[in-house]
Amino acid sequence: MRYAPHASRYSLFALAVSATLLPGAGWAANGDLAGARKPPSVACSWNREAALSYEERRLDTPLPFSGANVVTHDQTPLAERIVKGAGFDGFEPAFAKRLCAADGRTPVSSYAKALKLVTEEGRALWRAAVDRAQGRRAIPAGALPASDDRMLYWTRLYMTRTLRQWAPSFHLGKAQAQALQWRFERASRGQLDIDLPRRYAADGSRYRRMIISGFDVFTLGTPGTANTGLRNGNPSGATALALDGREFRLADGSLLRIEAYLLPVSYDPFNRGMQEDTLGPWFRPGPRRVDASITISQGGANQFWLEAWNGRFHGSSAGNDGIVYCPADSALPNYVLPLGSVTNPGTAPISLRGSGCNINPPRRWLGYDSASRWRQNLPAQLSKASLPVRQLLAADTWRGIERPPGATSQAAEGFDVTWHTNYDFFPDCANPRTENVPTNGVMNAMPDPSLVLPPNRRICARNGGGGDYLSNESAYRNTVLRDAFRLEIPAGHIHVPVMNNYYTGVPASGGGARNDNAISDARYEAYRSAIVAQTRALLVGVGNALAQGAQAD
């Protein structure tokens, strides 16, 4: 969605009802419009015993508040501290009031009206998060910085919990309730707000249209167990919020327009086709077709990785919902979990066909069914990125980036950038033995081409360059969709440096005191600012390569 440079085009949805003033009507003593017709309402209530999702059960979990490495002792749940600290604590109460007011009545009298409401509320939450990140939403003194991304994730969970507990008097079937959750998830991630322009701007400048994705926070620990992982942010999510709707003038005078959305760190939404349903409409032919599609996630320490190869394989790490798609003792490409399997205690059972060790994009976008029967190269085991690597490495995107305390790199400033050409594979797809092709190790320059070894079609992927988790999955689905549409555009993945670095009390990390009870500190915020700034420079570099007609490496 495009935003005005200094003022938001959007505001929170007001709880107001319009009325037509009929002849002779006037204002009643209670402030209502006398003679006006009020919308019909139905009874409603709350089911506080409704089973919460695995992620929602973290809402009451605090950071460590006693013991070693704790300076402050705040026992407030981390989610509450983040949401209040960002000024987002009004969203869930307002949402609850729209669903069911204090008098036990609601104008949401049907499933269709409920679907409309959750779409509105989800989009309002996304817009508010983008506005905050881009300086269009007031931030009180002492609040978390505008660049913080975490309030969107935790506010969303407060709202999905409320929606789950809503009990309208009209019949709301299980499938309908799930559809409401799905729509809210998509709307609150910016997936319904993408709005690419036509070819030319009002001033005659040509547009270069780019879609980027970021991720939720992740590695949040076990619900109910205090841990420092809860305070994690995600620099890819912060980048998405900072850049959604932004335009940048490129070297040739054209305009780069960036539209952004967020993805969850759980396998089921990917298996349902969330990413393809977001990107697919913009990959189709038409006057607003995308020119570049870049997925972004958090990778390793102090380096940007431009991934060369994305693998079809799922690893054995759980998503934020606790579900694992490829158990370690069954980790072969053709393994599929039986429906109803529970992969971790307290998590939802497997409910989607094709949930297993290989990624299966949806038939509606892929053009064929890859989930019913495993076929080695339908789709490909390793999908190649099409990034203008040579131009990005030559752009010196580290220039002008203030290096955070404790960060190291070969470059004079900022972080190193490397073409990440490694991958792991099964030589025999039915045998668990794997082999590795290492990366080239060259920073801030193109490597010798002889160090870049492409895979062959006889092997099966074990890891893409960025591993086997959901960042690799987003990258794989993006490039497979590119190929399904036979697009020749920049499409690839940027792994950004790890952001979740707090003071440790030692000089090498900046010398600040370690406090595992703190929700933020200056070192953490310095990492976020530096990573977002250099990621922006890389994306503008992709835009300049587009303008120059550069070829992918």
Predicted regions and their residues:
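Bacterial N-terminal signal peptides that target proteins for export
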Residues: 2-13
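N-terminal catalytic or cofactor-binding beta/alpha core of small enzyme domains
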Residues: 30-461, 478-479, 483-488, 497-499, ...
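Substrate-gating cap/lid alpha-helix
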Residues: 466-471, 475
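An aromatic- and histidine-rich active-site surface loop
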Residues: 504
